[in-house]
């Protein structure tokens, strides 16, 4: 079972950027169940009563260097999930997803953080012309979000070249508790026996990831040997 395979490890201090988001809250619960120490940094209020008193929740912007430097002081492992999503204005996407990542990497490096786990996106592959995609395939960022994600990975590689352990994960769209937006609506309609629209003939495959599986992948990046995870 999961509990045997991912046994509780040594207690570490984790910083989760975007801690109030879907991945952030699921990862927070996952890490707390592992006995880990969690600090959340998010521009939004963290409004989950089940974890609020068990973590250090800081409201702040990753684009603010003073905030980033302050929260990084006691941190051993960073999980960088914060991002401006594709619907945001291009300048917001680049300032958050590129400049924000640069601020975090710089502070993590200067404070000697053990690992910086960067949550990228399958958007770095653009519109693929073949399957399956491999981690060493060419990156083609389509649109501001895809371009920003490619640039942020480049920053990660720069700091990895300076000796930091910087695992990069490229998840597909993920689903799970707290996932808002259209998915929540579709599930509600299905649960209530209502009809909901199907695009096209209804047979086109789309790849989703369970957020719990993503949390386990992050945990492995945090706990396995650097020789395995630092790529």
Set out the residue ranges of the language-model regions:
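N-terminal Rossmann NAD(P)H-binding glycine-rich loop of SDR-like oxidoreductase domains
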Residues: 14-34
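Rossmann-fold cofactor-recognition segment
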Residues: 53-63
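NAD(P)H-binding glycine-rich loop region in Rossmannoid oxidoreductase-like domains
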Residues: 62-96, 107, 124-127
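Glycine-rich NAD(P)-binding loop of the Rossmann-fold in SDR/ketoreductase-type enzymes
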Residues: 63, 92-103, 143, 147-148, ...
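Conserved Rossmann-fold NAD(P)-dependent oxidoreductase catalytic core, especially the SDR/UDP-sugar
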Residues: 99, 103-145, 159, 167
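Glycine-rich "substrate-gating" loop/helix at the edge of Rossmann-like oxidoreductase active sites
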Residues: 142, 172-180, 200-212, 226
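Conserved beta-loop-beta element that borders a ligand/cofactor-binding pocket
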Residues: 153-177
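Alpha-helical substrate-binding/gating segment
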Residues: 187-196, 206-231
